[in-house]
Curated annotation (Swiss-Prot):
Protein name: CTP synthase
Membrane-spanning segments: none
GO biological process, one term: 'de novo' CTP biosynthetic process
Activation/inhibition comment: Allosterically activated by GTP, when glutamine is the substrate; GTP has no effect on the reaction when ammonia is the substrate. The allosteric effector GTP functions by stabilizing the protein conformation that binds the tetrahedral intermediate(s) formed during glutamine hydrolysis. Inhibited by the product CTP, via allosteric rather than competitive inhibition.
């Protein structure tokens, strides 16, 4: 079967939820038995988002093959079963980087390199390669129509219709239809102007998704269809909802999937959304409620911890517990003391880089350990737990990570190239100083709490870090009571730790949040929320 392409653009304003809309449509098509994948094309010049500040761009989502990608790929994986890879996300910077590399290598045989055809051809080639073996590829174009940065992508997708055939391409445009309170009606003019802008580029949209805070009336949809030259049944109202997991059903109720399958001549059964109905039911009918504190330094933009926040809510679904999330700046712990943590039912320290706020995280880990509060540390959250335990239990008062103090007396966390043999000779490794990225196997210690949670010995989880627990100091830490619960496949690197003297104190070097989905959850987060509920009950019994 020939691959079909759905190109999704945005208009009027940004942040309308284009990624969620794309993922929701993909979920419906997948529920019809189609093999679906999604791409995100980002117009910024960075080669990838790996070095962009989380405060500016949100989290970096890591794929199984180790690509550092846009957070929208996290939405894609949470809505469909297909796993994303480095092929599913690229930027303007990556395209130019690759084209210039080829030019320097002489691949273009001295030709003058231009946006058309060299840049656009590279974009089209990547789209076609990603679509191989799939029935439908949804391609989300980042940014807003009219932005200068998006023009090469828009030109490339315009050309795609001529290359793969108009019968196998569909252009979908998502716009804002604002409600004007003073007039008491929605206004369609911004959508008309946005479509006009798209037409000037040579793209006639086939489907319009109208975002609004309320349902767009049928007469207004008919007006949009008339002025924008779109079929009336292809003008879809997408109102605000209290849960993003209601959007697949909302789109299906307007027969968007039927329209697309008819357009592509796809013969497939009706979508079965029973799994999503179950998710919505669990979300609407909790039997309990807990408060989890996320202690980090990027809390000014919650999207910096998007996958962690979503994973906590997924765990709440599995436990039928509503999860209230309290974002706490780690520097506030330093300046205002750990008292700001006292009303929490559980504490999570997520990943991060840099020294700012790290002492507040160490104080938080100590508070959770001493007060017997359920604790989940992720990446840096595991490293600060190691540092805290070494300082206050294992007899290493000056313990630290070399990321923060390069010449510390007890470098319990360090680059592998900074580990020292007992005779003080540097132990070198070709792994040192490199970022560990992507999915890697971890061997769990039989009988550990981690083993009980996962229910198996070998697990696969995704990594994004440079620093590791220093094996040269590990024996002293273990002798003080901390348990290594998981090791890398070669038994050389610590992947998980736990504290047996605590009811639920676990930390991982990997990022389990990237494998959590609303339909399946994740065992580590599910166990964490269950422990939070049990802790809450114990505290109530003490009153």
């Amino acid at each position: 079967m020939k691959t079909n392409y759905i190109f999704v653009t945005g208009g009027v304003v940004s942040s309308l939820g284009k990624g969620i809309a794309v993922a929701s449509l993909a979920a419906i098509l997948e529920a019809r038995g189609l093999k679906v994948t999604i791409m995100k094309l980002d117009p910024y010049i960075n080669v990838d988002p790996g070095t962009i500040s989380p405060i500016q761009h949100g989290e970096v989502f890591v794929t199984e093959d180790g690509a550092e990608t846009d957070l929208d790929l996290g939405h894609y994986e949470r809505f469909i079963r297909t796993k994303m890879s480095r092929r599913n996300n690229f930027t303007t910077g990556r395209i130019y980087f690759d084209v210039l590399h080829k030019e320097r290598r002489g691949d273009y045989l001295g030709a003058t390199i231009q946006v058309i055809p060299h840049i656009t051809n590279t974009i089209k080639q990547r789209i076609i390669e990603c679509g191989e073996g799939h029935d439908v590829v949804l391609v989300e174009i980042g940014g807003t129509v009219g932005d200068i940065e998006s023009l090469p992508f828009l030109e490339a997708i315009r050309q795609m219709a001529g290359e793969v055939g108009r019968d196998h391409t569909l252009y979908m445009h998502l716009t804002l239809v604002p409600y004007i309170k003073a007039a008491g009606e929605v206004k369609t003019k911004p959508t008309q102007h946005s479509v006009k802008e798209l037409l000037s580029i040579g793209i006639q949209p086939d489907v319009l998704i109208c975002r609004s805070d309320r349902a767009v009336p049928s007469n207004e949809r008919a007006k949009i269809a008339l002025f924008c030259n779109v079929s009336e049944k292809a003008v879809i109202s997408l109102k605000d909802v209290d849960s993003i997991y209601k959007i697949p059903a909302l789109l299906k109720s307007q027969y968007l999937d039927d329209y697309i399958c008819e357009r592509f001549s796809l013969k497939c059964p009706k979508a079965n959304l029973s799994e999503w109905e179950q998710v919505i039911y669990q979300q609407a009918n909790p039997v309990g409620e807990v408060t989890v504190g996320i202690v980090g330094k990027y809390i000014d933009l919650p999207d910096a911890y998007k996958s962690v926040i979503e994973a906590l809510h997924h765990a709440g679904l599995k436990n039928r517990i509503a999860v209230n999330i309290c974002l706490i700046h780690s520097q506030d712990v330093e300046t205002r003391s750990v008292k700001i943590l006292q009303d929490l039912d559980a504490i999570l320290i997520p990943g991060g880089f840099g020294y700012r706020g790290v002492e507040g995280k160490i104080m938080t880990a100590q508070y959770a350990r001493e007060k017997q509060i359920p604790y989940l540390g992720i990446c840096l959250g595991m490293q600060v737990a190691i540092v805290e335990f070494a300082r206050h239990v294992a007899g290493m008062p000056e313990a630290n990570s070399t990321e923060f103090v390069s010449d510390c007396k007890y470098p319990v966390v360090a680059l592998i190239t900074e580990w020292y043999e007992e005779n003080n000779n540097r132990k070198l490794s070709n792994l040192g100083g490199t970022m560990r990225l992507g999915s890697q196997p971890c061997k769990l210690t039989y009988g550990s709490l981690a083993y009980q949670i996962y229910g198996k010995t070998i697990i696969m989880e995704r990594h994004r870090h440079r620093y590791e627990v220093n094996n040269m100091l590990l024996k002293q830490i273990e002798a003080a009571g901390l348990r290594v619960a998981g090791l890398s496949e070669d038994y050389k690197l610590v992947e998980m730790i736990e504290y047996p003297a605590h009811p639920w104190f676990i930390a991982s070097q990997f990022h389990p949040e990237f494998n959590s989905t609303p339909r399946d959850g994740h065992p580590l987060f599910t166990g964490f929320i269950k422990a939070a509920s049990e802790y809450q009950k114990k505290q109530l019994n003490k009153m």
